[in-house]
From Swiss-Prot:
Regions that span the bilayer: none
Protein name per UniProt: UPF0147 protein Ta0600
Xref: Pfam families: UPF0147
Domain of life assignment: Archaea
Family designation: Belongs to the UPF0147 family.
Family matches, as Gene3D superfamilies: Ta0600-like
InterPro entries: Ta0600-like_sf, UPF0147
Organism: Thermoplasma acidophilum (strain ATCC 25905 / DSM 1728 / JCM 9062 / NBRC 15155 / AMRC-C165)
């Protein structure tokens, strides 16, 4: 992985960790953030596949009407960084 990619990967992992510990978002969002972090950590699959899987999981949560506005903003931030990571 190129250094820029590694920095972006670390940033995504940090944001997912922050989201998983945010008690102001519903429990299902925190669970998906934890699952997403675990999925991204599995190095036995290609990065593109891991990113696509996590993007799907996060997109489903972003469309949940029970997610507060700030939680949705966090999800969209992570989604955009993941899309950039998968294209690099």
């Amino acid at each position: 992985m190129v250094r820029v990619d590694q920095n972006l990967f670390n940033e995504v992992m940090y944001l997912l960790d922050e989201l998983s510990q945010d008690i102001t978002v519903p429990k299902n969002v925190r669970k998906v953030a934890q699952d997403s972090k675990a999925k991204l950590s599995q190095e036995n699959e290609s990065l593109d596949l891991r990113c696509a899987t996590v993007l799907s999981m996060l997109d489903e949560m972003a469309n949940d009407p029970n997610v507060p506005a700030h939680g949705r903003t966090d999800l969209y931030t992570i989604i955009s960084k993941l899309e950039a990571l998968s294209k690099s």
